[in-house]
Amino acid sequence: MLEYINEIKAWWEETADSEWYQSRRTEEMIRSVLEKPESAFAPQVFGLLEKRMGGFAGKKVLVPSAGDCHAAYALAVLGAEVTASDISIRQMMHGWRIAEAHGLEMDFVQADTMQLEPFGGEEFDLVYTSNGVHSWIDKPEKMYANIARVLKSGGLSVMWDIHPFQRPFSGERFVQPEIIKAYDDVSPQGDNHWRVMDLVNAMAKSGLCIEEMLEMSDISYFYAFGEEKEARAADWRQNPMAALPTHICIAARKG
C-alpha cells in the first residue's frame, strides 16, 4: 500500500511541471477562472453546487486532489474559505504561488486523498472532488469514510468524474469504438475504473445520504480541444460515444 502511494506521489511530483499543467497555469487561463468562476465547473455541476449549498460565502470547503486548483480558485472567488489539498507538494506550491499573485486567501496542504490525515473531524461544509480523482483511488470506501469524517454534520460531498460507462470502450471519436475491457474490470493496468455501484456503495457505507445524481452528455465541455468542439460531436449517429453519458456527478450529505 505504501509503495503504491509513493509511486503515485512520485509520478505527480514530476507531472506537476509537465507542459499540459503549465498550460493550465497561464495568466490568460487563470484570469478566465477568476473573472468567471463558474467556468471551472461543468455547467450542470455548478448549478447543483449552487442549489445544494445555498451560496458559498463563508462556507468552509475542501478540494482534495486539487490538481490545477481551478475549482479551488473559483470557490475562493465566490467567497468560500477554501483549503486545496493534493498528494503532490509541487502542485500545492504552484497553487499557492498563483493564489498569492492574485490576492486569494486560501490554504494549501499536502495530503493523500484516501487518508486526509492533516484534517480533523467535522471541519468542512463541502468536500468537492473533480474530474479524474477516482482513477487514482484504490479504495473508494476509505476515501469516502474520510470525506464523511471531515465533513460537518449536514455537510455536502460532491464528486464529478468521467462516467464509468465510458471505461469499457476505446473511446475514439467519430468511429465505432472497440470494447477493450469488461465493465466489472475495475483495475486495468494500474488504473481504477470504478463502477457506479462502487461509488454509491462507498458513499452509503460511510454514512453519506445521496441527494442527487447527474449523468451528463455535455459533449462541448468534455471534448474541449480541436475538432471535438464541432457540433457533430454531440450527435451519436456520427460520434457513437456520444450515446453514453460522459460524466457523472453525485451529491451526498452527512446526516
Model-derived regions, located:
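Conserved class I S-adenosyl-L-methionine
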Residues: 1-57, 70, 156-186
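Class I SAM-dependent methyltransferase SAM/SAH-binding core
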Residues: 60-115
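Core SAM-dependent methyltransferase catalytic element
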Residues: 206-208, 229-255
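A short acidic, Gly/Pro-enriched loop at the edge of an enzyme's catalytic core
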Residues: 118-127
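Residues lining the SAM
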Residues: 129-131, 160
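Short alpha-helix
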Residues: 190-213
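A short glycine-rich, Lys/Arg-flanked "PGG" loop and its adjoining helix->strand segment in the class I
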Residues: 141-156
